Amino acid sequence: MNLQTERLTLRPFSPQDEDAFILGLEDRELRRMYGFPAELSKETARRIFRQFSTLSTTFSLIRKADGILIGFLLDVPAELPEHILHTLPEGGRTLAFATFVPYQRQGYMREAIQAVVEQHSEAEDVPFLHGGHFPFNEPSQRLFSGLGFTSYGQHTIGNVTILDEICML
């Protein structure tokens, strides 16, 4: 399924996206913000691409003006620890995303997430959307807040804290 915004087409990953995806992950700061290892070989990036490609709701964000892959967005079953998940209705989804560095801070991800929120709202198929971010990732926190997500707590994976944002639909 494709989603359209004013400037983007959100479509499933395809093999033609692999090289641009790997190139996009070369940025160390993007990897830090997303939680990827600081050092990421091309083979590991290819493995991540293939893993994401198996999910039917991994979207490539394609800029309409030139057909360039500018990032990705995953829309997967809610991935939250039980102590948070049990306080929410069943059937929520988690959004995870990255905008490649040359295209950040231009509103593209806001458009993409808004399209996914609207699609789920219209379909009435999920009760909530979840997004998580690291405490140092203030741009993601501002993005979620601006889209109507509210702070819902935090959890840890190993020794890493994730702040959780929820948007009830």
Residue ranges of predicted features:
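Acyl-donor (CoA/ACP) binding surface of acyl/acetyltransferases
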Residues: 1-29, 58, 62-169
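Conserved GNAT-fold acetyl-CoA-binding loop/helix
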Residues: 31-50
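Soluble sensory domains of the PAS superfamily and closely related sensory modules
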Residues: 52-54
